[in-house]
């Protein structure tokens, strides 16, 4: 009976697709209603959990929906989990799905059948919001006419007007406004619909909102829609604000024009130094437009990363830098920081771009100063810096490749310390993740940071080998050991359980190809030596219970120089106390798993010479499957587990 129930449910599920023929009926020997109204637990590999009605609404299968509504007692408001625009939406009803997919006829059928028109998803998204997102004016009008709440908000207090404004659906915005949508409502972040329209550059939407009484409110970062438009380089939108003198004071206009010009001077896509200077000049002229009421700049303290640049404060000073692009760049970075503030997440991007340009020009030191400052800003605001850290590793590898002697430990060690701090921060986020958090994203970032850390340690070992050529003293060495010990003490690992030592001896680990490929090749004896010296365990196991020795002899790079490196690492591991008879989850020792005969012979020789009575006893217990859990001192349990295929310990 259970198998028959499953098969019939499956047939009804599949019949919801367009062109399916099963909609006409079902097995008469079983009550069809059971298969139509069953809970939405038909889980799919992609994360969806759907009823036949929801699937039919998703696919626009009008005939199937009509059959269900007219012949069966279906639950119209059954909540399902659906994939919409690449994301899983939890608690979506058939009406929400039909509205979001743009199936007007099905929307009408469901509403007429009694579907709750304001039934929200788990994130408090209504069917009207889904229709506004897609810009389906016909569905929006129908839902409003049938009682949809135009001012309904989601969990972030973001209403339907905001999403329509962000997406640039001009006619939908006008319809919402005409039906009572409040133009000046604010989301939890303080943003209004005008912020979203200005950010996206939708001039027609901005004008519609202004015509319906929208004002320039500040969000939680103190940014108005005018500043939002300026920071995103939407000149036409900013001019629309300026053309309405009741919206902005003269000083507010000046500030917005300065931000527009400063952003043009340091934007990756729309960089235009002439436009930048033009807007800065226009702003300065406005400051002095009334000789009796000059609007002075509120100049901030200088920033070392910007060459301690002091902003120009009058027209002669601005004229003096017209032909000096570097001065315009530094002026603009200082202006952006003054206007946006250090807590604004948009501030670092221009700094990173300017640093990248300097690196391309071979001005590596200035690049490092800017990038270090950008990382500090992001870490201060709890923003992930995994890409920034990788970018630094790439830069250091480039410097070593281009001008070998201009990189020192004073440059690399602070970045390595920041990498360690970022990994620690990520580990805390993953451990304390709330139900609505995204731990998989943090785990991906952690994986990247672990690999970047290894790149940096590898670069440090390269520099340390040139000790005679550099001023590398005991203080540098102690700084290195201190940071590496923190990595090890915090048990830094990839998602699959590999420690830094595992990664350091992995000969087939993918290496970033942007300069680091040439510099950071593995396995690396020097890197492994530093890790072991700082306390990395040679018997630590990953999720497949492979020790670093297993990884060394199975993840093999067959080039001749790498094989010699592997032999040195093998000897290092033996001296550090590696257990040669430790088995992985497949029951293999390093010797039995080894892919290179020359290394296998070495392993067998060492195994014969170094196997202890303690190891033999552990292997005997494992071979005979004797129960030892709780019967011996706890420190011995892990030792026996190392020699056993069965996983006994948690």
From Swiss-Prot:
Example GO biological process: proteasome-mediated ubiquitin-dependent protein catabolic process
GO annotations of cellular component type: ubiquitin ligase complex
Chaperone as a keyword?
Answer: no
Tissues where the protein occurs: Primarily detected in the embryonic central nervous system.
Q: Which UniProt keywords apply?
A: ANK repeat, Repeat, Ubl conjugation pathway
Positions annotated as ANK repeat: 48-80, 90-122, 123-155, 156-188, 189-221, 222-244, 496-543
Q: Which PANTHER family match?
A: ANKYRIN REPEAT CONTAINING, ANKYRIN REPEAT DOMAIN-CONTAINING PROTEIN 16
Q: Provide the family line.
A: Belongs to the fem-1 family.
Q: What is this protein called?
A: Protein fem-1 homolog B
Native organism is Drosophila melanogaster (Fruit fly)
Lineage of the organism: Eukaryota, Metazoa, Ecdysozoa, Arthropoda, Hexapoda
**Encoded by which gene?**
Fem-1
């Amino acid at each position: 009976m259970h198998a028959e129930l499953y098969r019939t449910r499956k047939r009804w599920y599949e019949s919801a697709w367009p062109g399916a023929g099963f909609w006409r009926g079902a097995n008469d020997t079983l009550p069809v209603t059971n298969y139509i109204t069953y809970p939405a637990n038909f889980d799919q590999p992609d994360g969806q959990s759907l009823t036949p009605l929801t699937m039919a609404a998703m696919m626009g299968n009008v005939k199937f929906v009509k059959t269900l509504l007219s012949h069966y007692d279906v639950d119209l408001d059954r909540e399902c989990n659906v994939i919409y625009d690449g994301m899983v939406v939890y608690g979506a009803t058939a009406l929400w799905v039909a509205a979001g997919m743009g199936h007007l006829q099905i929307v009408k059928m469901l509403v007429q059948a009694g579907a709750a028109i304001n039934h929200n998803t788990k994130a408090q998204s209504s069917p009207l919001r889904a229709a506004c997102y897609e810009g389906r004016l016909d569905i929006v009008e129908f839902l409003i006419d049938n009682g949809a709440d135009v001012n309904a908000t989601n969990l972030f207090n973001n209403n339907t007007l905001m999403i329509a404004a962000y997406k640039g659906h001009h006619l939908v915005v006008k319809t919402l406004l005409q039906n009572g949508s409040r133009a000046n409502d604010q989301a939890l972040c303080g943003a209004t619909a005008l912020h979203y329209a200005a950010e996206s550059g939708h001039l027609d939407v901005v004008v519609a909102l202004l015509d319906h009484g929208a004002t320039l409110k500040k969000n939680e970062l103190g940014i108005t829609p005018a500043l939002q438009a300026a920071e995103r380089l939407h000149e036409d939108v900013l001019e629309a604000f300026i053309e309405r003198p009741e919206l902005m004071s003269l000083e507010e206009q000046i500030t917005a024009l300065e931000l527009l010009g400063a952003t043009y001077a340091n934007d990756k896509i729309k960089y235009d130094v002439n436009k930048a200077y033009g807007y800065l000049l226009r702003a300065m002229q406005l400051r002095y437009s009334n000789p009796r009421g000059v609007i002075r700049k509120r100049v901030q303290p200088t920033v070392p990363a910007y060459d301690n640049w002091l902003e120009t404060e009058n027209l002669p000073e601005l004229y003096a830098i017209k032909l000096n692009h570097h001065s315009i760049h530094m002026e603009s970075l200082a202006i952006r920081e003054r206007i946006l503030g250090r807590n604004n997440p948009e501030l670092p991007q221009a700094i990173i771009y300017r640093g990248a340009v300097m690196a391309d020009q071979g001005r590596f030191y200035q690049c490092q100063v800017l990038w270090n400052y950008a990382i500090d800003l992001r870490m201060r605001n709890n923003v992930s810096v995994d890409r920034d850290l990788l970018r630094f590793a790439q830069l250091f590898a480039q410097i070593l490749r281009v001008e070998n002697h201009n990189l020192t430990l004073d440059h690399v060690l602070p970045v390595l310390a920041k990498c360690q701090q970022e990994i620690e921060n990520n580990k805390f986020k993953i451990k304390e993740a709330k139900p609505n958090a995204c731990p998989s994203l943090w785990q991906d970032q952690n994986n990247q940071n672990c690999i970047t850390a290894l790149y940096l340690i590898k670069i440090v070992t390269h520099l340390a080998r040139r000790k005679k050529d550099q001023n590398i003293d005991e203080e540098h060495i102690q700084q290195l050991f201190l940071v590496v010990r923190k990595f090890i003490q915090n048990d830094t690992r990839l998602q699959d359980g590999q420690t830094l030592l595992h990664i350091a001896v992995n000969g087939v680990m993918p290496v970033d190809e942007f300069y680091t490929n040439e510099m950071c090749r593995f396995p690396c004896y020097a890197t492994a030596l530093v890790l072991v010296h700082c306390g990395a365990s040679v018997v630590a196991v990953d999720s497949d219970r492979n020790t670093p020795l297993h990884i060394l002899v199975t993840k093999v790079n067959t080039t001749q120089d790498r094989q010699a490196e592997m032999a040195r690492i093998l000897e290092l591991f033996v001296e550090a106390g590696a257990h040669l008879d430790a088995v992985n989850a497949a029951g293999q020792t390093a010797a039995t798993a080894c892919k290179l005969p020359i290394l296998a012979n070495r392993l067998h020789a060492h195994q014969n010479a170094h196997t202890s009575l303690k190891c033999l006893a552990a292997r005997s217990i494992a071979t005979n499957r004797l129960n030892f859990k709780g019967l011996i001192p706890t420190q011995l349990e892990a030792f026996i587990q190392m020699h056993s295929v069965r996983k006994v310990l948690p």
